[in-house]
Structure formats: structure tokens, C-alpha cells
Amino acid sequence: MAEEPRAPEALSSTFMLNMTSDASVRRIVRRIGTLARRRVQQLPDMETFSPEFDPELSEPPFLPFSAYVITGTAGAGKSTSVSCLHHTMDCLVTGATTVAAQNLSQTLRAYCPTVYSAFGFKSRHINMTQRVSSHGRSTDAALEELQRRDLAKYWPVLSDIAAEFRRTKPRGLYSGVSGPAFEVLRDMHQGQLWTTNVIVVDEAGTLSVHILTAVVFCYWFFNAWLRTPLYRRGRIPCIVCVGSPTQTDAFQSSFSHETQVNKIRECDNILTFLVGNPRAATYVDVARNWALFINNKRCTDVQFGHLMKTLEYGLELSPDILAYVDRFVVPRAAIMDPAQYVGWTRLFLSHAEVKTFLTTLHATLKTAGQGRAARGTGGDGGGVTMFTCPVECEVFLDPLAQYKTLVGLPGLTAHTWLQKNYARLGNYSQFADQDMVPVGTEQDEERVKVTYNVTYVKHSSVSVNCKTKKSICGYTGTFGDFMDTLEADSFVEAHGHEQPEYVYSFLARLIYGGIYAFSHGGHSLCENGEYVAELGAVPLPGRTWDPEVTAGMELGELPLEVAWDGERSPAAVFYARVLAPPAANSAPLCSLLNIYNDLRAYFRQCLDVAVRYGGREFRDLPFCTFTNNMLIRDNIEFTSDEPLLHGLLDYASTTENYTLLGYTHLNVFFGIRGKQQPQDAGSSRMPRLMVKDEAGFVCCLEHNTNKLYETIEDKSLNLCSIRDYGISSKLAMTIAKAQGLSLNKVAICFGSHRNIKPGHVYVALSRARHSNCVVMDRNPLSEMITGEGNPASGYIVDALKNSRALLVY
């Protein structure tokens, strides 16, 4: 009898919510396409912006632009529209922050720069002082005056970018290139401001208004200088601004060199400017060019979604909503107790609170470890291992002497400068939150070097702060998970797009080294004679390998100093007869693929034998393998008899969770594949951190080096260099840093802060994936006055009533 067809499984709520957005997202794409085709009749005269020009003193031409605004509640699917834009039209997708940019890169599987990188911003521009303009100060100032104000304010940076562009790009480079030929050239390279007029900016609510003007200026200047078809046709730039004006704020810092004080103040962000300024809103026709995403699709809890919409739109906080939020409140002592809510991310409002919590956590773990040691039950803090690594900060004396003369502070010493600028350095190099104490000072004729010790917890979750290189050198997990990864080819898909030969060579090395675990993995099957016999009967790989390849392979290329105890174990036979996989640059891709497939098949057969004798439970046994013969000293230091750690190069993602495993002093490849990067001067005492990614692969992280420049009277002085590890603990972070991240479980501590904004509550709550994964020490919403909130909420409510605005459910 024929089997009846099975009823289709019910579709998930998340899938249904995403599908309801499909038609509206298509409308967004069509509308942006229409804006992208707009042209200007009178081209702006970019010759005005000569090296001698100053918009504060002379009136610049108006630079036309169009804009499309995409806002919505947290997790509502705004990035869905960005993905559709990326796949359906030529556009430059950028993020306002590094986290936003790498989040987009991960989602789109394509490189997405920050908006600052897109218009040519470099590290030397960070400390260039922004000017105060006398233009555009009145409340009814025209858009031309507002644009001139922003140009004058940011002109020290923009003029330097323009000067560098003139030096590095030939003038009129594309003047003789036709439109079709230019499109071919454009498709061969990554998007730039001179290859497309559609620029997408994610998390635009964190950017000050002058960044919008900077993007528009650089678009017109770059295209005019190169004489691209975009400029010759008069194509107007279309800036697609994505984010939430109620979730985020833009801040501007100003540093006084005379007092050595850094002041930070809030300023208008791009989204609020476009939807709230009457002249800007009219110019870009925001009523027609605005899409609002309504439903939270990250967390499908109806009440939680209603809370998000209430905060997004600044609606009245009803007693029911306040009672719902009260459900999340727990005693503050419970949140501050490291022994409770283990594995949850603590969120605070200030860096000082984060640092205090981490210091308390480390002290608690250390005390627990000492107690266990005194009782003779182990001294690792209950299974927790802590370690310290040095961080180096160098102040250069010659630039400091010039700086003191220029700012009129002859008595300023290196130690005083470092003390007064420590907060700036911490934020600059992203180590402000860490449990770090000074341990030593060295001085010579050129520099003063201060060394700090930063404390880390093994197996804690960390995130990467910046664009950091990683060398993938091993795997740790289970036998079954490793086999599933090989079978699914997920690693190859994620890393093998540019140079797959390196990926296959790397995986072949891991499999080759991992065969040892079947015979000497410390499991009970090692003593089973029948298992050992059948494992030894598995046909060895390598018989079909290309003779030209195997001729260049030598035994011991991948040294595995294993004590065989005089036995001819299956592993001993394997390593005696099967040659180590060749390096990626010494064999053709087809041969490397053949070797990888043979080794993978052999590993699968060995695992099948182990499962037959050990049951399905064998798949869950611990398994680890490395490209080197790795030893772990004191449970924390990765070392090897080889001086160089072999690995696969890639960039670490700021949006991915990494588990901290320890550190290594081995030399590591971080330069071009096949070439060793020279050791940084002065970094010999700094180890490199070892982490595990979400898939189980072990990576070695490159050091993070930042150089702090001060620009005084057109002189750029490199005063300081900071070398750290470029990571932050996910045990605790500020609410501002959490913006754009999806955290599994969050414990929020608002402390005794006053004047907490609804946006703080909004961002903190919306980081969780489920309403059951949120706790906080108090409910700030119950303390807020009715109607208090972000002014942008009023503009959003007006848009909801506007039939021309697009609502995406």
C-alpha cells in the first residue's frame, strides 16, 4: 500500500513575518532606483574647491543630493531591504561603525566598509579639530547655509582627503571611457564613491549631520576629478540612510589642548536631521521617501514587540506596559554578583561600571580558586582559569616636545600627558572597559613605555573591536561536529571564495593531524583489540594521488612526535605510510582537492568504526587537532616544537562570538600568504591570543596597534602608540557598545543614574533574542515623565499618519 503524503510542516512565525515584508521591500527598491536615475541640469563647479578654498570664507556651490530613509523597531528587518538593494542594483553598502559594517559583510557575504573608509577617512584625521562655523546658525537657515556650515566645520578633514585624492588619482582618468565600458570596469572592482551614486549607510542614527555632507561632497569631488560618466551625466547621489533615530544618538567630542580636557556633547544625527529639519525634509521629500518597518522579527513575543513599538514611537507608557517591564526587575545585588546569571552579558551605562564589574568578577574567581586550593580541591576557581597579558603604551618624546611648544604647555611631561589622556586612549584603542593595571615603566631617549597587565578569563566570551587578522590553526569540539563540518562544506563555503587551494590544504592538514585521536585519544576503545584491528583494516588514503605531487612530499613535513610505545598502532601505520599534505603553493588545486577528499573519506571510515564499537556516544567525545604538533602548557599557553605556527589567514568578525582559550608566543603568519610578517618592534613580550570561533575552529589573533596623532597648526604629530589585543569581554559592556549586536541573554544594570533616556532602555532590552532572557535592576520607564523622549518619535508618529510614507509590517 502506497504511503500517504505527509502534511507539510507549519511555517515558523519568523518566516511568515519576513514574507509579509516582501512586497513592500520591492517597492523600496523601485523607489530608490527612481531616485538613482535623477540628474542635475547644472553641474556643480567643483573647480571652486581648490587647495586654497575655505568654505568659511567663500561661498561654495550647493551640492545636490537625494535621500531615502529606512527606519523601524529593533529587529524589524531593516537589513532585509539592504540585502535586496545589494542584490538588485549597483550600490555601495557601508556601516556607520565597524560593528555595523562587519554585520553587513556577514549578512551579504561581501565586503562592506565603514562610511568613513568609503570617503577616505584615515587614522590621522581622528584628532583633527572640527571648527565652529558662523554660518547656518539661525533656526530658519536655508539648506544651502546648513551645507556650508557642515563643510566649514569639517573642512580640515575634507581638504586633506581632497589633497590626497589629487596626489594619488590622475585627473580625468575616466574622461575618455564610455558608459558601457565604465560599467564593465565597475563590475571588476569593489564599490567606490566614483563607481555608483547609490550609497547605503547602516546605523545612520549614530552619525553627526556633517558626515552626510562629507559623503555628498566626496561623491561630487571624486567623480568630477576623475571625469566619470556619473559626473558627465549629472547623476545625483542617492544616500540611503538606515537605522532608528530613537534608538541611537550622535555625539561629538572636542579636545582642549590648553586644558587637556576632552568634552563630549550630543549633536543632531543624520536621521533626525532628514525627518525633523523642515528644509531638509522638504528638499528630500521625506514624506514620500521614507519606509518604516513596524514588527520586531527578532523576538516574536507579542508583548515584547508591542513594548519595542511603544518606545520607538514615543507612545504613552500605559500601566500594562509598565507592569510588563516590571517583570524583568531583579535585585541589583543579583546582577552584580558574578556567581549569578552566569553566561549572561551585563550591560551598563558607563565604562567605569563595566570595568568595576570585571574587576570584581576577577577578584571573586581568584578568591574562589585560592579557597579550593586551600581545601586541596584544585586551585582553578572552580574550573575557571585566569591569566594576564601585557599591553604596551608608548609616548614619543620628540613629538611631545613639539606638541608642548605648540600648545603652550612647557611643563607637560610624558607621564602627565598619559594620565590626562588615558580615557581618550582607552576609547581610541577600545581597552577602556578592561581590568588593566600598570606594572612597569621604561624610558630611553626616544620614548616612554608604560606596560599594563590585563586580566582575562579562559573560556569567556569575547568580541573583536576592530579589523583584526586571524590565523586559523586548529579545531576543538567533538568527533561528530568535526565530521559534520567537513561533510557540509560550510567551512569551504565561508573561506574558499578567493583562494580555495589554501582552504583545502588547511583542512587536509587538520584531518591528517586528527587521525591520531582514533588510536591515542584517551578513550576506552584504545584498549579494545577488535576495535584496533578493524581500525587498522581501513584502507589507507593516498593511492590515487598524483605522482608528481607525492614526489615532492616528504615524511615529517608535519612533525608529530608521538610515542608509539613500541606498538604498530593504526595511527603509527598511518603516519608511516601516508605522506603529509603538501603546502597550498606546491600543488595544483585539483591535486589538493583530491587529497582532501581522500583524507575526509578515511576520517569518515575511522569514525564509522569507532561508532560501531563505542556507540553514537563516541561522536560526542572531545576532539581536537592542529596544523602543528601543539602542546598546551599550564592549561593556557599553546606551544610547539616548531617555531612557526601554520594557519589559514582571514579577518576576525566583530559580530561573531569568540571563546578565549589562552595565548601563544609562537611566530605566526599575518602577512601575504606565504610571506612572514616581520615582528613588531617592542612586541616580543606580548603573546598572541588564541580563541575559538562559533564553529569550533581555533584562531590566533593579530595584535591591535593604534597610533594616536594630534594635528596642531597643520602639523600632524604621532604622540603615542598603543599595542593591545583588540578584544572586549562579552561578560560586560556598555549599552552604547551593544548597539547593533544580538546578545543571547542580558542583565541590565542602570545603577543610580538619573535622566536615563528611553533610547537607553530601548537598546538594552532589544539586544535579547527572547523576553525570557532579560533582567534589569530597576524600571526607568516608570520614572519618566509622560511625553518625555526623543523628539524624533513625534516625526515618526506623523509619518505613520501620512499615506505617502511606506509602512512595512
Swiss-Prot record:
Major location category of this protein: host cell
Annotated ATP binding sites: G72, T73, A74, G75, A76, G77, K78, S79
Subcellular locations according to the entry: Host nucleus
Pfam families recorded: Herpes_Helicase (PF02689)
GO biological process, one term: DNA replication
A single Gene Ontology CC term: host cell nucleus
Record carries keyword Hydrolase: yes
GO molecular function: ATP binding; helicase activity; hydrolase activity
Keywords noted in UniProt: ATP-binding, DNA replication, Helicase, Host nucleus, Hydrolase, Nucleotide-binding
Transmembrane regions: none
EC number annotated for this UniProt entry: 3.6.4.-
InterPro entries assigned: DNA_helicase_dom (IPR003840), HSV_HELI (IPR034711), P-loop_NTPase (IPR027417)
Superkingdom of origin: Viruses
Function of the protein: Component of the helicase/primase complex. Unwinds the DNA at the replication forks and generates single-stranded DNA for both leading and lagging strand synthesis. The primase synthesizes short RNA primers on the lagging strand that the polymerase elongates using dNTPs. Possesses helicase-like motifs and therefore may act as the helicase subunit of the complex.
Family named by the database record: Belongs to the herpesviridae helicase family.
Subunit structure: Associates with the primase and the primase-associated factor to form the helicase-primase complex.
HAMAP family in the record: HSV_HELI
Name this polypeptide is given: DNA replication helicase
Origin species: Epstein-Barr virus (strain B95-8)
Taxonomic classification: Viruses, Duplodnaviria, Heunggongvirae, Peploviricota, Herviviricetes
